[in-house]
């Protein structure tokens, strides 16, 4: 993985405590604390979540202060650690998607994040429900009109510097800036003000995966205490704010949140990633022939990268006389000269890069130079919703849909959405989720304490009973299965 953010930060000797030992509550204590947290979340009227690097480590992004964190290894002279996949392909974790569900149900009012990995926005959390205190490695902002641009590639700079792109607003056109802070940069006032306001309103601030060391952000959760609110902390290391918290849990964040969601009978939605390409075909007449140019580019501009594409195969299934080709260099472009009077079908196969949930997806493109295609713009949100429903129903990626097309004489351009990944978190074999059997007694029924804690109706627990029955048939004790 490219950890560009850590590499681009200016050098600083004092980064606080690093390499702190990890603490794990015993299974019994962890179970008890998860039950307590589930009650706190269920009873909360204004829940605010404060997140740090620890919620993203299960996606392959190293943290900063843990035993193998970025700053821990740098201090020992080992440099920036590697990771398991490209930064731009990092997938929201179980915790990210659980927060999306909590927001949809109305329980979660706001998220305050110190992370720059864009996983909260990538997960589907509404922008208006999120404050990114340290910026976003995939976001640019116009300093003039304040319009934000969320990209599918990592921005080249940090430190609120100019980027190569300009605002697309015809009445503006100002040079864009990155949004990621360097050490000496002040926190963005808009994000800070929103975060402070939400913490003051909160009756519960849940801190997830953060050491609560970076000021002034680390003091925000405590603002809830002034109005009678409470603070709960889930982290593998001790934090300076533990003594002020009503509940401190030492455990893996995904495991804790999976348990909370299960106890509240809430489903963790799948993560479905959709990427976009722009396809254009321009032509010029040369006697009885047509010279045409095909381009596959980013919707963010002709020079912007397409990080999710490794190559594009162009073939002509109905025309054996037309030679297929594999485009390997970005920007993807192909020039050909063909007869004006012979229409053909172009098959574009997009070969995806590492980290995608499938290897490729194909789009048919009918070409007839004697006919001008019509222009249209479809309802983007509706199309994406239908596309994601189809991906979830089929449990696989690769689906695609056209969002808009512009047809003019001698040219046509269209934008397509492609599902490039789908990850489920609610299956029994999910490594991060807590098996349902963990919360059952040896006879397969839910513990009375669990039902009392969440107001669960035993008649609605058919799935839990089926799981327990399967375990008994296999000769396993549901109460002793490994988490």
UniProtKB/Swiss-Prot annotation:
Cofactor: Zn(2+)
All residue ranges annotated as the Deacetylase sirtuin-type domain in the record: 27-267
Protein origin, superkingdom: Eukaryota
Keyword annotations: Metal-binding, NAD, Nucleus, Transferase, Zinc
Residues where Zn(2+) binds: 142, 145, 167, 172
Cell compartment(s), UniProt: Nucleus
Active-site residue list: 134 (proton acceptor)
Predominant location: nucleus
Class of this enzyme: transferase
Swiss-Prot/TrEMBL catalytic activity: N(6)-acetyl-L-lysyl-[protein] + NAD(+) + H2O = 2''-O-acetyl-ADP-D-ribose + nicotinamide + L-lysyl-[protein]
Binding sites annotated in the UniProt record for NAD(+): 53-57, 63-65, 114-117, 209-211, 235-237
Database matches in InterPro entries: DHS-like_NAD/FAD-binding_dom, NAD-dep_sirtuin_deacylases, Sirtuin, Ssirtuin_cat_dom
GO MF terms, alphabetically ordered: chromatin DNA binding; histone deacetylase activity, NAD-dependent; metal ion binding; NAD+ binding; transcription corepressor activity
EC number: 2.3.1.286
Phenotype seen when the gene is deleted: Enhances histone H3K9 acetylation on transposable elements and promoters of hypersensitive response (HR)-related genes. This leads to increased HR-related gene expression, hydrogen peroxide production, DNA fragmentation, and programmed cell death.
Family, as annotated: Belongs to the sirtuin family. Class IV subfamily.
Further remark: Plants silencing SRT1 undergo early senescence at 3 month-old when grown in greenhouse. Silencing SRT1 gene leads to seed abortion.
Annotated function: NAD-dependent protein deacetylase. Has deacetylase activity towards histone H3K9Ac. May have a function in the safeguard against genome instability and DNA damage to ensure plant cell growth. May act as a repressor of leaf senescence by histone H3K9Ac deacetylation. May negatively regulate metabolic signal transduction involving methanol and jasmonates during leaf senescence. Required for histone H3K9Ac deacetylation and repression of AP2-1/RSR1 and amylase genes during early seed development.
Protein name (database record): NAD-dependent protein deacetylase SRT1
Organism: Oryza sativa subsp. japonica
Protein's gene: SRT1
């Amino acid at each position: 993985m490219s950890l560009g953010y850590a590499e681009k930060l200016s050098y600083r000797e004092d980064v606080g405590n690093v390499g702190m030992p990890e603490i794990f509550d015993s299974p019994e204590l962890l179970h008890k604390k998860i039950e307590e947290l589930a009650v706190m979340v269920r009873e909360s009227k204004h829940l605010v979540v404060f997140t740090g690097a620890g919620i993203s480590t299960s996606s392959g992004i190293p943290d900063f202060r843990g035993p193998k964190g970025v700053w821990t290894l740098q201090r020992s002279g080992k440099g920036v650690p590697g990771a398991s996949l490209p930064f731009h392909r990092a997938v929201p974790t179980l915790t990210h998607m659980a927060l999306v569900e909590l927001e949809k149900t109305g329980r979660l009012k706001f998220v305050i994040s110190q992370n720059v990995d864009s996983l909260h926005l990538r997960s589907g959390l509404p922008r208006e429900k999120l404050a990114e205190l340290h910026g976003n490695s995939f976001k640019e902002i116009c300093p003039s009109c304040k319009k934000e641009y969320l990209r599918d590639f990592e921005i080249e700079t940090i430190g609120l510097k100019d980027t190569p792109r300009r605002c697309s607003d015809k009445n503006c056109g100002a040079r864009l800036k990155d949004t990621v802070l360097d050490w000496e940069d002040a926190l963005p006032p808009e994000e800070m003000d929103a975060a402070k306001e939400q913490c003051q309103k909160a009756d519960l601030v849940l801190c997830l995966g953060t050491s609560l060391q970076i000021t002034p952000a680390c003091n925000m959760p405590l603002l809830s205490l002034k109005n009678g609110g409470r603070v709960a902390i889930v982290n593998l290391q001790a934090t300076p704010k533990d003594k002020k918290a009503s509940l401190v849990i030492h455990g893996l964040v995904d495991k804790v949140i999976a348990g909370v969601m299960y106890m509240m009978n809430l489903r963790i939605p799948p993560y479905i990633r959709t990427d976009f390409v722009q396809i254009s075909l321009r032509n010029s007449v040369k006697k009885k022939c047509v010279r045409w140019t095909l381009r596959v580019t980013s919707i963010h501009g002709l020079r912007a990268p397409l990080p999710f594409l490794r190559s594009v195969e162009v073939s002509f299934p109905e025309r054996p006389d037309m030679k297929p080709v594999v485009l390997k260099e970005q920007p993807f472009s192909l020039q050909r000269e063909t007869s004006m009077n012979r229409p053909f079908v172009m098959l574009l196969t997009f070969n995806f890069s590492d980290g995608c949930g499938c290897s490729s997806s194909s789009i048919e493109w009918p070409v007839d130079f004697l006919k001008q295609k019509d222009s249209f713009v479809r309802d983007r949100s509706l199309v994406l919703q239908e596309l994601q429903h189809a991906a979830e129903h089929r449990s696989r990626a690769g689906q695609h849909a056209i969002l808009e097309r512009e047809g003019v004489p001698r040219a046509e351009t269209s934008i397509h959405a492609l599902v490039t990944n789908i990850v489920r978190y609610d299956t029994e074999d999910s490594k991060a989720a807590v098996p349902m059997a963990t919360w059952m007694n040896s006879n397969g029924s839910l513990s009375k304490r669990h039902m009392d804690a969440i107001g669960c109706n035993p008649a609605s627990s058919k799935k839990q009973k089926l799981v327990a029955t399967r375990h008994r048939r296999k000769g396993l004790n549901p109460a002793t299965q490994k988490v």
